[in-house]
Design a protein with these regions (language model features):
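Accessory "access/gating" subregions that flank catalytic or transport cores
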Residues: 156, 166, 178, 183-197, ...
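Conserved short loop/turn motifs at secondary-structure junctions
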Residues: 48-51, 69, 150-155, 279-285, ...
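C-terminal segment of N-terminal export signals and the immediately downstream linker at the start
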Residues: 27-63
Length: 348
């Protein structure tokens, strides 16, 4: 009993000393601790250094674009022009006629679109890929019975392909996502997509990332190889189709109904050689994943890609997926991740 009392007295004394020490901690020390915690939180964010550099350079690049063109810009123009491979080439490109050369921030592929492109990359003699890229094994999984049985069949039937993709990923620097980890577009949205960036993936529904305010374009294997090697990626300067969303969804209406309605207006070819840029107060009524659904299906009207302006829904999604630091950086340049006010006031 006495031993317990002594221990308790020592504990109380130590606690009091600790309280005094805590009360004398300076504000800078608390700030340093907070910053250290924030730094620790970023350790799980993929390619964080690249993202940090992107947002540090974005305002300067955009300022140079504004100085050269001297006019209000659409969001599409902002994202294209800050990604010019040769910034000095900037001019008033003719939409639908001139070609521009771009430098994407990241790339991706899957187990069907990837193998031939990677084999071509291997002939280049490059030691590593030139930009962050992910490889997702999802297309060779056939949904028939259930996850366990279907994955067993996929692993058995595609063992050589999966082994090859895993090995080259380790050797050349791809992030490899094995079968069963998800559909590539969702994997990208949850782990890689961030507002303002540009991404190339060998899949027609890559524009899903437009729901995150990203310029994401589906490409062929040869285009992917150009990006992996750090070469210029050429694109015909797209036309821009502005779609103003007003009001809010009601009743049984979902985000998918928005793109279905738009598809009926544009037809299956109406978006060819064009980027669909959404704007208006109605955008804020849609979730980030709802926006992603709309952009995903923009491929059905032939659009090069689709994109939404940065808003709070993207902040919430980034926060929910452990990327609050990315959300904070995007918020710092929020006005430049949307079309200029003059454009929204007079889109024509």
């Amino acid at each position: 009993m006495s031993e317990l009392q002594i221990s308790r007295r020592k504990l109380l004394k130590a606690s009091a000393a600790g309280a005094v020490a805590a009360s004398t901690v300076s504000a800078p020390s608390l700030l340093m601790a907070k910053e250290a915690k924030a730094a620790q939180d970023t350790s799980k964010i993929r390619d964080f250094d690249m993202i940090k550099a992107f947002y540090a350079n974005y305002p300067k690049k955009l300022a140079a674009v504004r100085a050269k063109l001297g006019r209000p810009l659409t969001l599409t123009e902002k994202l294209l022009f800050v990604h010019l491979y040769h910034p000095e080439s900037l001019t008033e490109f003719k939409r639908g006629q001139d070609y521009i050369e771009l430098r994407p921030d990241r790339a991706g592929t899957h187990d069907i679109g990837g193998p031939m492109a990677i084999l071509q990359f291997l002939t280049s003699g490059k030691e590593r890929i030139a930009l962050p890229a992910a490889l997702v094994a999802d297309h060779l999984v056939t949904a028939q019975t259930g996850v366990r049985k279907d994955l067993q069949i996929a692993d058995r039937d595609n063992v050589e392909t999966y082994s090859f993709l895993r090995d080259v990923s380790r050797r050349y620097g791809f992030d490899f996502w094995p079968a069963g980890t998800g559909i590539c577009h969702q994997v990208f949205l949850e782990n890689y997509d961030f507002p303002g960036a540009m991404m190339l993936v060998t899949d027609s529904h890559t524009p899903t990332a437009g729901g995150m305010g990203m310029l994401a374009i589906g490409v062929g294997g040869a285009d992917l190889v150009d990006a992996l090697m750090g070469m210029e990626w050429e694109l015909k300067m797209p036309k821009i189709i502005g779609v103003k969303l007003t009001g809010k969804l009601s009743g049984w209406v979902s985000a998918k109904d928005v793109i279905l309605k738009l598809s009926g207006i544009l037809s299956t070819k109406g978006g060819t050689n064009s980027i669909i840029e959404f704007f208006g107060d109605g955008c804020q009524q849609l979730s980030c994943t709802g926006k992603g659904t709309i952009c995903n299906m923009g491929a059905e009207v032939g659009a090069t890609t689709s994109v939404f302006p940065f808003d709070d829904s993207m902040v919430r999604y980034l926060n929910a997926t452990g990327r609050a630091a990315v959300a904070d950086m995007a918020k710092a340049v929020a006005a430049d991740l949307r079309a200029d006010k003059e454009v929204m006031a007079d889109p024509a």
